[in-house]
């Protein structure tokens, strides 16, 4: 039943291109060598072996989502120390954007909880 909560948690739901999402699957996020081309043409997503590198514009959002999921579901969503360090780095390197704050307010009103990894930056 917890998986259903995780699966339907609005902080974990984003529109995505089905083929990209399916190919990424549960691969770990990494920074891949620049010699690896984009996997989906003009979409700046790279996938190589069991690793995936998202576009720069998505990294902060991904980081805050992963950090939230680990915080909200600690017994079910775990990151390796390496993934946690990468998510911390992306969170710092790619600041919260205005649209994230607006989205978080709407989700909090509907879902009844906040994503502290977004909301703390919105209150500043």
Please report, for each region that a protein language model flagged, where it lies by residue.
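Domain-level detector of nuclease and nuclease-like folds
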Residues: 1-124
